[in-house]
Amino acid sequence: MIVRNTRHTALRLATLTVALLAVLGLVAACTKSSDAKQSDAPLPDAKTVIDASAASARALHDVQLDLSVDGSVPNLPVKSVAAYLTNQPKVSGQGDAEVTFNGTQVKAKFVVVDAHLWAQFGSGQAYQDMGLAADIYDASAILDPEKGIAKLLSSVRDPKVEGREQIGGTDAVRISGIIPGTALAGIVPKAALGDRPLTFWVQEAAPNNLVRANVGFDNGTLSVTLSDWGKKVALLDPKTAK
C-alpha cells in the first residue's frame, strides 16, 4: 500500500512537473514572439518622434537630471550634476554637483531658489549663498521651453532613427542628428559653439519623453540623462538646511 501511494505521488509530481514546464515554455515562447515583433516592427519616423518629444519637453515641469562630462566642454564649469529640477511655481532645483569654482574642482550639494545658487561644501555645514545661479551654472534652465531641452529637440537637423535600445529600463528609439550651438544655450551657456553631432534617445511610447542626449565636442562628450518625468520633490530651505 505504501509502495502504491509512493508511486502515485511520484506520478503526480511528474505530471505536475511536465505541466509546469509546458506552461513555462509557452510563456517563454510568447515573450520571445512579443520581443521579436517589437524589434522587427518598422522604426518610427524621426520627425514625428522629435515633434512629440519637444511638445512633451515644453510641458514638462519636474524632472530628475543626471549630467556628466567625459573630457572637457568649452565654457562649462561642470563635471557632473545629479539633481531634481522644477520650473513651477518658479525655477528651482537641488542636488549634487562637481564643478570648477575659482579654478578648483569641488564637490557640493546645491539648492537653487529665487534665482540664487546655494552650496554646501561639507556634510553638516550651512549652505552658502553663492550669488545668481545664472552667473555660475543654472541646471534648471534645462526646463526652459525657449532654451532648454525643448529648444534642443526642435532644432535638430538631419535626424535619422538608428534603432531601438533600453535606457534605464525605458524602451527608447535612438536618433542621430546635428545640433546648432545656439540651441545648446540652456545646457552650455556663454559658449560660442558651432554645429555639433548629437545622439539622443526618446521614449518610444507616448508621451515620448527625452531619455538621454549625448553631444560631441572637440575634446569631450556631454551626456544628459532624464528620468522621473513629472515627479515632484520637496525642496530644501537652504537657509536652515544642514
Residue ranges of each PLM-predicted region?
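Subset-of-secretome marker
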Residues: 2-5, 31-242
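Bacterial N-terminal signal peptides that target proteins for export
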Residues: 2-18
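C-terminal motif of bacterial Sec signal peptides marking the signal peptidase cleavage site
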Residues: 26-29
